[in-house]
Amino acid sequence: WGRGGRCVAAVGVWVQGGSGGGGWVGEAGLLVGAGGAGGAGALGGGATGVGGAGGNGGTAGLLFGAGGAGGAGGFGFGGAGGAGGLGGKAGLIGDGGDGGAGGNGTGAKGGDGGAGGGAILVGNGGNGGNAGSGTPNGSAGTGGAGGLLGKNGMNGLP
C-alpha cells in the first residue's frame, strides 16, 4: 500500500488504502479494508488560476469496509475552483465515503462538490460535498445511495 497505491493484501488482513494526492486513489485490500482518502486539489495560480480537482476516495474491500472520503477541490486563485473528489464505494458492509467540497473560485465559477459514495447492503450512503462559491457558485454534490439496511446520504450545501 502507499500513497495513491493499491493494496493487494492476503485475505482477512485489515488494510487502509493510501491517501493519494489530487487525482490519485488509495485502494483497500481486495476483500477487507477501508478505502483511503483522496488528496486535496492543488491551489490554482499562474496564467489560468484554476484550482486542481480533489482526488477520489478509494473503494473499500468487497466484504467489509468504508469508502474513502473525496478530497477537496483546490482554490482558484484568479480562476475557477476545482471540483471535489468523489466519495469511495463501500463494501457489502460499510458506509460510503463523503464527497469532497468544491473549491472557491475568484471571479469565476466555484467548483462542484463531489458525489457521496454508495453503500450496498448494511451501511449508509456518503454525503455529497458542498458547492464552492464563485461567479456563479458550483453545484452541490448528491448524496450516495444507502444500502438495503441504511439511509441515503445527504446532498451537499449549494
Feature names for model-found ranges:
Residues 1-158:
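Long, compositionally biased tandem-repeat segments
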